[in-house]
């Protein structure tokens, strides 16, 4: 029988044979995180390749932007898997958390920021007024960088918070994110590009609207508004077959109507935090004031 080496802190020494079968389990979530990084990298490459076609009038740029958006969407999917796999296999680690954060900066910060500028600003009609074009391009640099900066700040805030759940999370059996998660912001950018047929923006009013969306997403990521995290979904609970049916239906809709369905899902999720915030403000204003306790102020 092999000897189990136990350290002073009660953990099993890595040299012990008891730890060797666990190494493969630790590598599994890291494999998904590495895939996340790869998808972010190739998304940036595709955005660059599409942007280089601006000089030729944009002919042939659409396939590159479509792939860039799809790679971001696949990265969102992998990002949702690596954490769940680590928790299911009890292989969470500080290294895994840090690597996952760096992967998120690449796939959901840099990749969508580059795509947002290349698709939304790079192909403006050259016939528009030069002064307008110059200003739109300048704001394009600023707001695409702002998206990256706010997404990175969102990740940093999440990492340092011991309990990144709002003090008033609503129903106690549900978990919420504080602010829009950076994968959701990246998914919104990718879904708009994908739903448009990946045809880049040519008219400056549409480019201004695009920059306004980037500004909104940047604000939501660093806000303290509540967003449902979906982390409490458990298919092993009673009546979980209803969740399975819903997920199956959703997969069918995405498979057959991917462009409108993905855009609708991303838009609904982004809007959900705004609706929750507005609803909370309205409820507080409509809440009746507590009755004044006049008896305490009366002089006997």
Where do the language-model regions lie?
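Helix-coil boundary and interhelical linker segments in multi-pass alpha-helical membrane proteins
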Residues: 42-70, 114-142, 192-209, 256-260
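Alpha-helical transmembrane segments
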Residues: 28-35, 68-71, 102, 106, ...
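Multi-pass membrane catalytic core of lipid/isoprenoid biosynthesis enzymes
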Residues: 31, 63, 70, 88-156
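Active-site His/Glu-centered metal-binding helix of metallohydrolases
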Residues: 38, 77, 81, 85, ...
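C-terminal ends of transmembrane helices
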Residues: 84-96, 152-168, 222-230, 278
């Amino acid at each position: 029988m092999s000897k189990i080496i136990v350290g002073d802190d009660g953990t099993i020494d890595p040299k012990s044979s008891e730890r060797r079968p666990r190494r493969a389990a630790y590598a599994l979530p890291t494999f998904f995180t590495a895939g996340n990084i790869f998808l972010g990298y190739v998304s940036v490459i595709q955005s660059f390749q599409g942007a280089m076609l601006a000089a030729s009038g944009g002919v042939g740029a659409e396939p590159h932007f479509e792939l860039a958006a799809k790679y971001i969407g696949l990265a969102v999917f992998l990002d949702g898997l690596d954490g769940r796999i680590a928790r299911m296999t009890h292989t969470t680690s500080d290294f895994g958390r840090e690597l996952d954060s760096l992967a998120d900066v690449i796939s959901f910060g840099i990749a969508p920021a580059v795509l947002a500028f290349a698709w939304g600003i790079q192909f403006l009609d050259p016939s528009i007024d030069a002064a307008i074009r110059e200003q739109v391009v300048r704001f394009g640099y600023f707001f695409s960088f702002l998206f990256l900066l706010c997404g990175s700040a969102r990740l940093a805030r999440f990492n340092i918070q011991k309990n990144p759940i709002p003090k008033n999370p609503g129903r106690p059996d549900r978990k919420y994110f504080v602010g829009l998660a950076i994968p959701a912001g990246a998914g919104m950018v990718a879904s708009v590009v994908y739903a448009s047929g990946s045809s880049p923006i040519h008219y400056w009013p549409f480019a201004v609207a695009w920059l306004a969306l980037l500004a909104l997403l940047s604000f939501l990521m660093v806000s303290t508004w509540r967003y449902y995290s979906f982390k409490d979904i458990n298919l092993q609970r009673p009546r979980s077959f209803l969740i399975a049916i819903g997920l199956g239906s959703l997969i069918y809709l995405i498979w057959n109507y991917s462009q409108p369905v993905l855009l609708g899902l991303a838009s609904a999720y982004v809007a959900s935090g705004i609706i929750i915030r507005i609803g909370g403000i309205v409820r507080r204003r409509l809440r009746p004031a507590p009755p004044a306790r006049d008896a305490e102020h009366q002089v006997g």
